[in-house]
């Protein structure tokens, strides 16, 4: 019997689970006899059945259901104590969890460990002598690609001496992970202006480092838009889908984004009374605004997105890759600069040509909504979508094929 593939998605966001799920499905399609084990650290109630239906065995690494979207994660002090010891190390370089992962690997004896930006699992695999594949939307730790001034503008108190000392150390760690990986796959197109000083960028010319494009689930075909709308109780007018994302650094930023969406949409309804908005966000309370429908979480939102005039979303990278595979016009919004983990992504999307906004006023967001419902966003987004998905479609099959080669 062949050794299993272990999938180890980062527990911090549903996007890592979703990308690992897409790869799991494709790996199972390539070889239904290949055993796949998923070490699942978050949203077990949603993703355990999804991974099981994809042909994988699921092991929860936690004693209960974990959901990082329902609380904030940072203080406004950027120093060794609060940021490194209080957040970065326990979240991304956790010694206790490293021991747990090594124990799992010893029990499972995998042919390869596929880490979806789970850097703790990556380090454990490398130290344990297991073949390792890193799937990443990041070219380095987020802290490395942001300046102290970026954090100050977001309201952080920055200890420059301590943080400046941390950055090069983090890049060395990320570089070590890359150099000790059999394969590195990324779905983020490189931009020299943003990436030149990162750990991954100098390695992009190496044979085992690949920008592949969107690693997403299959895109739906022949969607019955009328049926999708009926199931959600929607009419036939212009439809906006607005998402407030998953993991947040500060809950007030998520709440501020929701209020801005609502105010901008209320303004839009004055000229487009048949317009509707589906507001999606884990833990989002119901609202009774005219034309607004709230949903907590939609495991498969692709059919809904194909019905929309545009998506309004935070720049979580799995969202970015899914809209690229679908060709959906998208407005990317950051509710607050304190969401530092998404600031680099927003800058990249802006450079590629997408409409973007940081802490927009309701008037500014309304103007973009108006462009969406009148069809004026299509040309603006077309070139940017091509940069994200050069082949014009998802790259999951190609990525799974590369992983399968490592197994062989």
Task: Locate predicted features.
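Active-site donor-nucleotide binding/catalytic segment of nucleotide-sugar enzymes
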Residues: 8-9, 19, 187-191, 212-272, ...
């Amino acid at each position: 019997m062949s050794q299993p593939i272990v999938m180890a998605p980062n527990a911090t966001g549903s996007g890592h689970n979703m990308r690992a799920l897409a790869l799991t499905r494709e790996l199972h399609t390539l070889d239904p006899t290949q055993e796949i084990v998923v070490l699942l650290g978050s949203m077990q109630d949603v993703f355990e059945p999804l991974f099981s239906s994809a042909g994988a065995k699921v092991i929860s690494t936690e004693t209960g259901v974990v959901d990082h979207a329902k609380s904030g994660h940072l203080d406004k002090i950027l120093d060794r104590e609060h940021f490194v010891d209080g957040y970065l190390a326990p979240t991304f370089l956790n010694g206790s969890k490293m021991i747990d992962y090594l124990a799992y690997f010893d029990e499972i004896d995998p042919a390869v460990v596929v880490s979806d930006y789970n850097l703790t699992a990556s380090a454990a695999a490398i130290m344990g002598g297991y073949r390792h594949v890193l799937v990443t939307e990041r070219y380095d730790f987020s802290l490395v690609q942001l300046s102290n001034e970026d954090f100050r503008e977001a309201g952080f108190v920055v200890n420059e001496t301590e943080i400046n000392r941390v950055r090069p150390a983090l890049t060395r760690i990320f570089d070590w992970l890359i150099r000790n990986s059999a394969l590195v796959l990324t779905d983020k197109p490189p931009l020299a202006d943003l990436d030149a000083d990162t750990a991954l960028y100098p390695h992009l010319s190496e044979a085992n480092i690949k920008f592949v494009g969107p690693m997403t689930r299959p895109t739906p075909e022949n969607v019955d838009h009328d049926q999708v709308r009926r199931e959600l109780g929607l009419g036939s007018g212009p439809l906006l889908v607005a998402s407030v994302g998953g993991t947040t650094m500060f809950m007030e930023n998520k709440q501020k984004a929701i209020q801005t969406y609502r105010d901008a949409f209320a303004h839009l309804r004055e000229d487009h009374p048949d317009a509707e908005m589906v507001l999606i966000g884990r833990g989002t309370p119901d609202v009774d605004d005219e034309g607004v429908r709230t949903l907590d979480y939609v495991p498969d939102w692709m059919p809904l997105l194909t019905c929309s005039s545009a998506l309004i979303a935070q720049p979580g990278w799995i969202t970015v890759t899914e809209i690229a595979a679908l060709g959906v016009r998208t407005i990317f919004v950051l509710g607050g600069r304190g969401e530092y983990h998404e600031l680099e992504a927003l800058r990249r999307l802006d450079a590629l040509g997408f409409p973007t906004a940081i802490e927009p006023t309701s008037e500014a967001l309304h103007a973009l909504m108006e462009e969406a419902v009148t069809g004026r966003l299509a040309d603006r987004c077309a070139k940017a979508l091509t940069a994200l998905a050069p082949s014009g479609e998802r790259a999951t099959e190609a990525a799974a094929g590369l992983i399968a080669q490592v197994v062989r």
